């Protein structure tokens, strides 16, 4: 199991775990990317527990944490086999599909924190800058 960890696991990662009795059956990680954007990684459910809603519970718990901490957006890089799962939770695909380790993958994003009057100007600038960067990336690569 130790080979599944990296430097981020010690400093910037928050975990969510769902248990069935004393056995962990689903898990996921939150990783802060910037002050306003975070990424979900390693969302996994044991095969015998797939279809029971545990992956959704993990994802929703991490979304709650994300919202509470003031992040604006969550992203996830998913294998195509899980794309519909995330779309059903409100994520939208963006960018091209790519081949990684023999599996086709898709990036998805979800707005977690809606704009409110009390958000500070620095956050507004960061959001606009991020959107401009996405626009420039998409126009350059399409």
Curated annotation (Swiss-Prot):
This is Uncharacterized acetyltransferase SPy_1546/M5005_Spy1274. Residues 1-120 form the N-acetyltransferase domain. Belongs to the acetyltransferase family. Gene3D superfamilies: 3.40.630.30. It comes from Streptococcus pyogenes serotype M1. It comes from the Bacteria. The keyword Repeat does not apply. PROSITE patterns: GNAT.
